[in-house]
Amino acid sequence: MELKDQLMQQIDRERLPQHIAIIMDGNGRWAKERGKQRLFGHQSAIQSVREVSEASAEIGVKYLTLYAFSTENWNRPLAEVSGLMSLLATTITKEVSTMNKNSIKLNAIGDLKSLPEANYKQLMQAIADTSHNTRMTLTLALSYSGRWDLTQATRRMAEDVAQGKLQPDAVNDTLISSYLSTAGMPDPELLIRTSGEERISNFLLWQLAYSELYFTPKYWPDFRKADLYEAILNYQHRERRFGKTSEQVTKK
């Protein structure tokens, strides 16, 4: 029996995280170590996205959110950004049939209107073409940052207050969450970051408040189903307290 199958059998399906978020890091370094251009790393990472998406859906995860392109990534060399946009366009179009086969619904969050028009249209078409799927929602964070998300939510709330649609004393945690781009999704219980970096890099700043963080030295292009299962097993061995004592959690 392969390692991935052994690990999958150890997972407690009753204690799965509903929502897993992943910072897919290390594509450039992975390519550089092989004497290749950074774009080669991004191209090679597509297989990781495919495997992790399929594995998540197979075991019963309901939401998978991937940090695909941050607002800060626009500052990268033009050739890399152009290559990424081209790769995004071709990949999304190619993967629609696979997502439908696995009943995976595509979603996207971020400043999507800042994407090139062709990319935006292809993305919206893929979202529409998979909207009937119910097994899992795969969300791509594109031109996204946590600060952008909080800023747009605050701006919209301020507009609603100014128009008399919202009373200031009605603002609470739940209301703020409803204005974020992830409205309607549970907060991630588990955040995975590859490549050995141990920071959240402006990703889902509000939503990660109580998430368990899992860091692996493996670069994203090398991340496979077995690695996902190891992260989930690590999560299942943790005690989530939400501010309570260990005794209170055990008693519950």
Regions found by a protein language model. Give the residues of each.
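Flexible, compositionally biased loop and terminal segments
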Residues: 1-252
